[in-house]
């Protein structure tokens, strides 16, 4: 098992959550979230994250319907992943993110009630779930 550093993005049209993790431990933690305008992030913030954390791989959550089919947001998440690769040359993997937001909301509520459910916290927690799910799928 390698000790790669990974960043995960939970893509959304209004907000994007970010998590960081280490492949050797298979664990991730919430890093941040930032606003997006119609799915377009502040690319300077993205560049700062990539520069600061120097990930070996970036995992982008792929929103799918429960039956596994694509939805309108799926194409936008793919486009975001392609732009990440094109702008910064980072290796990208897409990973099924079905139910990550539901799970994140439940986890946050359990720990802090309604006050823990702000949008940024939910998005960053969703990115953690996406990355931990990716780790599990590798084994």
Swiss-Prot record:
Q: Name one GO molecular function term.
A: nuclease activity
Cysteine pairings via disulfide bonds = none
Please give the InterPro entries that the UniProt record associates with this protein.
RNaseH-like_sf, YqgF, YqgF/RNaseH-like_dom, YqgF/RNaseH-like_dom_sf
Where is the protein localized?
Cytoplasm
Q: Name one GO biological process term.
A: rRNA 5'-end processing
What are its GO cellular component terms?
cytosol
Listed CDD domains: YqgF
* Keyword annotations: Cytoplasm, Hydrolase, Nuclease, Ribosome biogenesis
- Keyword S-adenosyl-L-methionine part of the UniProt annotation: no
> Could you tell me the EC number(s) of this protein?
3.1.-.-
Family designation: Belongs to the YqgF nuclease family.
Q: What does this protein do?
A: Could be a nuclease involved in processing of the 5'-end of pre-16S rRNA.
- What is this protein's record name? Putative pre-16S rRNA nuclease
Q: What is the lineage of its organism?
A: Bacteria, Pseudomonadati, Pseudomonadota, Gammaproteobacteria, Enterobacterales
């Amino acid at each position: 098992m390698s000790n790669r550093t990974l960043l995960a993005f939970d893509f959304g049209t209004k907000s994007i959550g970010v998590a960081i993790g280490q492949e050797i431990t298979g664990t991730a933690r919430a890093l941040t979230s930032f606003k997006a305008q119609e799915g377009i992030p502040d690319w300077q913030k993205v560049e700062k994250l990539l520069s600061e954390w120097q990930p070996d791989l970036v995992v982008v959550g792929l929103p799918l319907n429960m039956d596994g089919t694509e939805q309108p947001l799926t194409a936008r998440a793919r486009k975001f992943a392609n732009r990440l690769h094109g702008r910064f040359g980072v290796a990208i993997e897409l990973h099924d993110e079905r139910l990550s937001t539901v799970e994140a909301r439940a986890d946050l509520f359990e720990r802090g009630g309604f006050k823990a459910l702000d949008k940024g916290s939910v998005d960053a927690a969703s990115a953690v779930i996406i990355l931990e799910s990716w780790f599990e799928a590798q084994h």
